[in-house]
């Protein structure tokens, strides 16, 4: 029973995160509209509130294109895997109601964020374009260099929290 409750809680958490990101993009579009002295998205529904759902429907009904010489499966799986990794990071966040009890939540966070490097590298490699591969390798080098400083800052906070 506890497993089912934690599964439902994590599913609810993921849905809430995705919906909140959709409404944050709506807020961003509204703010950019007011900066440019216009209303922003307000044509759909009441004050444009259903606009993120319309954008999602439009996104899922678009034609799927891919490079002709690409590795089709890895070209599409790597962004999906990256999305799943970023959603898994939310599982180790300390909430008021504990979904999962992690003894090593910080290590899980570092592992999930560092696995995102491989998705960028696989996406660049699977397109079979030299420019995409170079861009992917550049992003990998940047991400790895930032992860080292993130890990050192996290360990310093962890070390000084026990003093």
Swiss-Prot record:
It comes from the Eukaryota. The chain crosses the membrane at residues 3-23, 77-97, 104-124, 143-163. GO terms for cellular component: mitochondrial inner membrane. Its EC number is 7.1.1.2. Keywords: Electron transport, Membrane, Mitochondrion, Mitochondrion inner membrane, NAD, Respiratory chain, Translocase, Transmembrane, Transmembrane helix, Transport, Ubiquinone. It holds the Pfam family NADHdh. It catalyses: a ubiquinone + NADH + 5 H(+)(in) = a ubiquinol + NAD(+) + 4 H(+)(out). InterPro entries: NADH_UbQ_OxRdtase_su1/FPO, NADH_UbQ_OxRdtase_su1_CS. It is a multi-pass membrane protein. GO terms for biological process: aerobic respiration. The keyword Transmembrane helix applies. It is found in: Mitochondrion inner membrane. Its main location: mitochondrion. One of its GO terms (molecular function) is NADH dehydrogenase (ubiquinone) activity. Belongs to the complex I subunit 1 family. Core subunit of the mitochondrial membrane respiratory chain NADH dehydrogenase (Complex I) that is believed to belong to the minimal assembly required for catalysis. Complex I functions in the transfer of electrons from NADH to the respiratory chain. The immediate electron acceptor for the enzyme is believed to be ubiquinone. This is NADH-ubiquinone oxidoreductase chain 1. It comes from Drosophila azteca.
